[in-house]
């Protein structure tokens, strides 16, 4: 019998902050399971979830507006600790008898708060001391409204000159509110505060660890599918790879992985996937060479969105054909992760989230009645990677830069041709190889090469040549919602350019993309 790793859990109510998923990831990093729900949950849903504590997230709305979101009143009647962050603090204050006003001064960015009263939330936590020995905390503010009167049974714990109630607390009820964001790294002691709330005040044990998550997932897979056969579309990406390893551990040869080689992968990627999962780990893999089929479907198409749809449609067709060849397969496995689940819930309820969903296998033939196995659906991407390491997958594969689902189909601008893909593969491999050699690969968030369908004149020896252009792209980002172009050293860029032009016959010019996001997107298409 595996340990119940969901026994202690935190409920996070989402009021729309761009940082809400980060709050959830921080709680998970503390070894405690949590779920992220929309703010308007019912009392019955909260009771059913049975949280050890509740966090109210930040949000973009103003609590002073008539129809702005409010926490369900049951949150404050459930008898569990409650932690309000930014907007969450403001709605807590208003709902419990305090007062919030729109402020003339927006407070955004770094601030230093002074701790004026003792509280379990910040006891012994400090970044510096005032002249008279009071603790100071470096925090990250992002708010327009501010609490101007706290509920009568609360005390002021910390303040700034412009924010008299930066932290408030009712120690008896274990209710806490902070006007800053403890989840961001700019709040230097933020993790300590979250740990104090989750581990000490809510008394949650650290049961949510990679090894225990694996044991739990394996037990659940076995319980769900029994001795039935399962099919999985293996792409070689992080999510499908970790899904494959979990399923293989749980059901062994009852798993069949279908690897569709669409001709749009990175250099030698198909061989690497087959070697690692087939030869090294011993998984049962069906290899489908489908390059010609994908390229013929893409012939003549220049529109990026149309190309994405064609690649998705052909993949589903190929996968379906392979699935129909297999006998007695009862289950389809997918590498759905928790942000995909959140996105689906947001779409269903009409509530906006900032996550761009990725799509897995998609439709199956109507004649195939299969159940769905999604062993990663409770996990964030960083958790999936940690589990992959625990399962023996190589670090370089798990922590590689993101690669788009349509692959080189959206990195070859305009029409996709085999010649263009082959040139791009080789150029991109040189760029990535040089980044690794210069110890720059892990210092940028994403790096890749783009094929431009334009010819440029060049000189080789005594002759002129008229060949293709590629652009190098490297960005630095925390959340991929915004990004800065990476300031790579000029001598490094020169070395990459020289290698590509000299070693890849057919490319005569290399440029470097210095566009940020916004206004540009990270990918060109």
UniProtKB/Swiss-Prot annotation:
Does the UniProt entry include the keyword ATP-binding? yes
Which InterPro entries does this one have?
A: Class_I_gatase-like, GATASE, GMP_synth_C, GMP_synth_GATase, GMP_synthase, GMPS_ATP_PPase_dom, NAD/GMP_synthase, Rossmann-like_a/b/a_fold
Q: Which GO terms describe its molecular function?
A: ATP binding; GMP synthase activity
- Note the SS bond partners: none
Organism domain of life:
Bacteria
Q: What class of enzyme is it?
A: ligase
- Keywords, ordered alphabetically: ATP-binding, Glutamine amidotransferase, GMP biosynthesis, Ligase, Nucleotide-binding, Purine biosynthesis
- The EC number of this protein is 6.3.5.2
Q: Which residues form the Glutamine amidotransferase type-1 domain?
A: 9-207
The coiled-coil segments of this chain are none
Summarize where ATP binds, as residue positions: 235-241
Q: Which residues form the GMPS ATP-PPase domain?
A: 208-400
May I have one GO cellular component term?
cytosol
Pathway per its UniProt entry is: Purine metabolism; GMP biosynthesis; GMP from XMP (L-Gln route): step 1/1
Its recorded reaction(s) are: XMP + L-glutamine + ATP + H2O = GMP + L-glutamate + AMP + diphosphate + 2 H(+)
Q: Which residues carry out catalysis?
A: 86 (nucleophile), 181, 183
**Looking at the keywords, is ATP-binding present?**
yes
Role played: Catalyzes the synthesis of GMP from XMP.
Q: How does it assemble?
A: Homodimer.
Tell me what this protein is called: GMP synthase [glutamine-hydrolyzing]
Q: Which organism is it from?
A: Shigella boydii serotype 4 (strain Sb227)
The gene name reads guaA
């Amino acid at each position: 019998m595996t340990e119940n790793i969901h026994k202690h859990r935190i409920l996070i109510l989402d009021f729309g902050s761009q940082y809400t998923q980060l709050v959830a990831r921080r709680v998970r990093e503390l070894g405690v399971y949590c779920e992220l729900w929309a703010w308007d949950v019912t009392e019955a849903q909260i009771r059913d979830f049975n949280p050890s504590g509740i966090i109210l997230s930040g949000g973009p709305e103003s609590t002073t507006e008539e129809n702005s979101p409010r926490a369900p009143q049951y949150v404050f009647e459930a008898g569990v600790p409650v932690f309000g962050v930014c907007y969450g603090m403001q709605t807590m204050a208003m709902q419990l008898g305090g007062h919030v006003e729109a402020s003339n001064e927006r407070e955004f960015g770094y601030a230093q708060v002074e701790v004026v009263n003792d509280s379990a939330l910040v006891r012994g936590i400090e970044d510096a001391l005032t002249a008279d020995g009071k603790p100071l905390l470096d925090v990250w503010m992002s708010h327009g409204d501010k609490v101007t009167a706290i509920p009568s049974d609360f005390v002021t714990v910390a303040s700034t000159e412009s924010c008299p109630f930066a932290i408030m607390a009712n120690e008896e009820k274990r209710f806490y509110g902070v006007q800053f964001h403890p989840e961001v790294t700019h709040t230097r002691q933020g993790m300590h505060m979250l740990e104090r709330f989750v581990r000490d005040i809510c008394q949650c044990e650290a049961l949510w660890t990679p090894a225990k998550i694996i044991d739990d997932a394996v037990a659940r897979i076995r319980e769900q599918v029994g001795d039935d056969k399962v099919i999985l579309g293996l792409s070689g990406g992080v999510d499908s790879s970790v899904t494959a390893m979990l399923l293989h551990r749980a059901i062994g040869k009852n798993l069949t992985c279908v690897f569709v080689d669409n001709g749009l992968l990175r250099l030698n990627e198909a061989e690497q996937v087959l070697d690692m999962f087939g030869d090294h780990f011993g998984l049962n893999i069906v290899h489908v060479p489908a390059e010609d089929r994908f390229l013929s479907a893409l012939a003549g198409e220049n529109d990026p969105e149309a190309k994405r749809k064609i690649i998705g449609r052909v993949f589903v067709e190929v996968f379906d054909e392979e699935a129909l060849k297999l006998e007695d397969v009862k289950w389809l496995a997918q590498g759905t992760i928790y942000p995909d689940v959140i996105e689906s819930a947001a779409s269903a309820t009409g509530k906006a989230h900032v996550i761009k969903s990725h799509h897995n296998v998609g439709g199956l033939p109507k004649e195939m009645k299969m159940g769905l196995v999604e062993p990663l659906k409770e996990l964030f991407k960083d958790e999936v990677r940690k589990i992959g390491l625990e399962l023996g997958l190589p670090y370089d594969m798990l922590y590689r830069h993101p690669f788009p689902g349509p692959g080189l189909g959206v990195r070859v601008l305009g029409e996709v041709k085999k010649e263009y893909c082959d040139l791009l593969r080789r150029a991109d491999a040189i760029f990535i190889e040089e980044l690794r050699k210069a110890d720059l690969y892990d210092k940028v968030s994403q790096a890749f090469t783009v094929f431009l369908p334009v010819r440029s004149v060049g000189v080789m020896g005594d002759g002129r040549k008229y060949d293709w252009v590629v652009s190098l792209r490297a960005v630095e980002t925390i959340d991929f919602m915004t990004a800065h172009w990476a300031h790579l050293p000029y001598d490094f860029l020169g070395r990459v350019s020289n290698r590509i032009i000299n070693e890849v016959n057919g490319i005569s010019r290399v440029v470097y993309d210095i566009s940020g996001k916004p206004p540009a997107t990270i990918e060109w298409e």
